[in-house]
Amino acid sequence: YSTGQTISFTREGGASVQDVIAQQVDGTNNIQIKWVLPNEKLSKVEVRYDNKKIELKGDAVNYTIENAANKKYTIGVVSFNEEGQSSESVYTDIRVGKTKVAFLGVTPTRDGITDDDEKAAADWFFNNYPTGEYLSFDEIANGADLSQYRVLWWIRDSQQTTDLPAESLDPSVVEAIKKFHIDGGGLLLNTHAVAYLYTIGRMKAKFNTEFTSGDGFDNGDTWNMNVYIGKAHDETSHPIYRGLEWKWMDGKKVIPLIGAGWKENHNSIYKDLCMYYNMNNTDENAYVKISEDSQIRILATWDGINDYFMMANYETLPTEEFKGTAIAIGIGAFEWNQNRSVNPYQKNIEQTTHNAIEYLKTK
């Protein structure tokens, strides 16, 4: 999917296209570009990249660049009204390269997964990514070549402990995954696995944490994630939330994740962020400090948080040392298998995950 970093240039003319996304087709070097047309008749649409202008009919909604080179592309889409006037130019970036994704696990094979949430996540992954591979930590310890993968996904969700398993802490495993991330590989980490960003040295700020395990409890509420950080930073446009519907709650934009019923509530979140810098929870300068010092982007908090007290989901940006991007999803409401009932918001769990994987594949 597109990175979501959109640049617009205003000029007189018609309305611009919306929701431009670029995705590398799995197993190929083809780039599929899609967009939504404005509510007016167009004479043509142009796709622009590498000093090329591809002219399409006014009703075109997609274009494919075939056999693209392994490099970063900046792709623009421009629409023209019936008078021939061009719209604002909308650009998005994509880096073409490997597309293979691996699902990490402790057990030797996928069949050995016992946790219900980890199993549900694995089932969804292999149904939606048939070219994906299961990769155990023992295989990594024995020298598996991680350079063949674009993204590694690890969900660790334990009822018994929040500690990371010994297999993941083997020095050879830590060093291999660290090198993968240093070299530009993407990481998607769920629940207790978000702590691995500290294990490999990407995150260093010693924020207070709230990591929980246990069997859970019955609860009649719908739990959401707040994506309007501090009521000032609207993350609904971030690519991992593409296609998800949000609603207003107490001046915040929230996305529902789990409905009434049994909840394990396995949080893996970081809190007292502002206190770490001796700043107030409502201080905008604290948000800037948190973001810039660790080179992160806070993507979600609990739905009752109105300030910068904590972060539940976040993105780590490339740094001078680590060229890779990571998405950490630690909010307790992000539960892959709701016990004893069907989660009416399961599609939001799945769509966020799909978006995150595709987003990381563009980096």
Label the predicted regions.
Residues 1, 65-85:
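Beta-strand-rich modules
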Residues 3-40, 84-97:
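Pro/Thr/Ser/Gly-rich low-complexity, intrinsically disordered linker/stalk tracts
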Residues 36-51:
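Solvent-exposed loop/turn segments flanking beta-strands in beta-repeat/beta-sandwich domains
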Residues 58-63:
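Short S/T/G- and acidic-enriched coil/turn segments that sit immediately N-terminal to beta-strands
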Residues 102-207:
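Helical hinge/lid and interdomain linker segments adjacent to catalytic or ligand-binding clefts
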Residues 112-113, 334-352:
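A short acidic/glycine-rich loop-to-helix N-cap element
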Residues 160-267:
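A glycine-rich, often tryptophan-bearing local segment used as a flexible ligand/cofactor-contacting loop or short
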Residues 221-332:
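Catalytic beta-strand/loop cores that center a nucleophilic Ser/Cys/Thr
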